[in-house]
Amino acid sequence: MSVPTVLERIVARKFQEVAERSARVSLAEMEHLAKGADAPRGFANALIEQAKRKQPAVIAEIKKASPSKGVIRENFVPSEIAVSYEKGGATCLSVLTDVDYFQGADEYLQQARAAVSLPVIRKDFMVDPYQIIEARALGADCVLLIVSALDDVKMAELAATAKEVGLDVLVEVHDGDELERALKTLDTPLVGVNNRNLHTFEVSLETTLDLLPRIPRDRLAITESGILNRADVELMEINDVYSFLVGEAFMRAEQPGLELQRLFFPEQVKKTVQQLD
């Protein structure tokens, strides 16, 4: 399996992280914490129901930094951003918990989820069942499995662990081979297509459009990365894609929730402006 260099470094660090964390909190203790966590909020169902109505099902991301862009947002208060997103019409939230490469934190997920009623995905690089159980203990409702970071056996193992603890799974692919592996290995309804090439970090919305015909109708295609303006949203919607994961476009805006409205619900922005007038 060829893994992109940046991803390879991140994955190697994740194995170290699991060893460090499980030395501090044992697997048995983590399982106990997971059992005591708030009930899952139904991440997949929320997206599916919204998309069925042909309404934008937006997973709004809370992300301070990235390896390719550095710090994206200086004024970073996860609870405030979460509330802004909920008011703006987000269906779900995505919170980065990776510390070393994205300046995320477990606490950010907890703070964001406590501030709203929306389901939340733990956005991190899952390589071990411990992290899945940890995600549930933190209160996450869904986890991300990145096909290019996992072999099929590990992918299936992580998905099985997620099911055991009541977590939904969003599987992420960025080419046809990965899509084939994901569909063969997992039965999750959520298939994310990352428009960012993990080898080059270049972004092309054609990635989603190219893979779309190969995604079965009983799965929900979610386009990730590169949605920056109304034209991008409309391009997806005319191709019957109503589920989006967007981070950077919102994080760079002064008011993330208002930017979400501008991109996905422009009619509501007009109404708000008229009310203010």
Curated annotation (Swiss-Prot):
One Gene Ontology term from the biological process aspect of the record: L-tryptophan biosynthetic process
Signal peptide range in chain numbering: none
Zinc is among the record's keywords: no
UniProt keywords, alphabetically: Amino-acid biosynthesis, Aromatic amino acid biosynthesis, Decarboxylase, Lyase, Tryptophan biosynthesis
InterPro entries: Aldolase_TIM, Indole-3-glycerol_P_synth, Indole-3-glycerol_P_synth_dom, Indole-3-GlycerolPSynthase_CS, RibuloseP-bd_barrel
PROSITE patterns: IGPS (PS00614)
Any Pfam family: IGPS
Enzyme nomenclature, EC number: 4.1.1.48
Cited Gene3D superfamilies: Aldolase class I
Catalysed reaction equations from the record: 1-(2-carboxyphenylamino)-1-deoxy-D-ribulose 5-phosphate + H(+) = (1S,2R)-1-C-(indol-3-yl)glycerol 3-phosphate + CO2 + H2O
Repeat recorded as keyword: no
Pathway participation: Amino-acid biosynthesis; L-tryptophan biosynthesis; L-tryptophan from chorismate: step 4/5
GO molecular function terms attached to this record: indole-3-glycerol-phosphate synthase activity; phosphoribosylanthranilate isomerase activity
The family this protein is said to belong to: Belongs to the TrpC family.
Name the record gives this protein: Indole-3-glycerol phosphate synthase
Species whose genome carries this gene: Pseudomonas putida (strain W619)
Gene: trpC
